[in-house]
Amino acid sequence: MIRALFSLFRSLHANTHPADLAHAAALALALALLPRSSLLWYLLFAVCFFIRLNRGLLLLSLVLFGFVVPSFDPWLDSLGNWALCLPRLQPVYRALIEIPFVGLARFYNTMIAGGLVAGALCYLPCYALARCAVTAYRTYLYPKIHHATIFFLVRNAPLCKR
């Protein structure tokens, strides 16, 4: 975990593409909105390791969003109830439930359906905000703190080096 955090620290200051960091933050929010009791959460988490993104930011954001998201559980439950009760989607749900092993994803649960819908709706705005934040950090804040003593000490700490 510490190595992942230092990887994040290096990525913020390196010449990496801001999209890698933004995708990590947006995917962490989408994962945090899903309950961890579903097979869908574990499948999406496993997919994260095959996508080009910053894993340090993914893990850090997942922990941070994990503290905030439980306060939205009633809203996610009602959103999932709304999504599952749509008459147009009833044939789709019936077809999905008949496919073997799809029932293990428990998409019929209101919390999981609400988290899936909310994660899909929040992905693009979170991506745009994170990308703008990384660009603003690199443009305005990094040149000001680049020569600070604390920045030099953290950058040259033994844990930061490989």
From Swiss-Prot:
TM region(s), chain numbering: 28-50, 57-76, 108-130
Predominant place of localization: membrane
Membrane topology qualifier: Multi-pass membrane protein
Protein name per Swiss-Prot or TrEMBL: Uncharacterized protein TP_0480
Lineage: Bacteria, Pseudomonadati, Spirochaetota, Spirochaetia, Spirochaetales
GO CC terms in record: plasma membrane
Localization (cell): Cell membrane
Superkingdom, natural source: Bacteria
Listed InterPro entries: CHP03546
Keywords in alphabetical order: Cell membrane, Membrane, Transmembrane, Transmembrane helix
Family matches, as NCBIfam families: TIGR03546 family protein
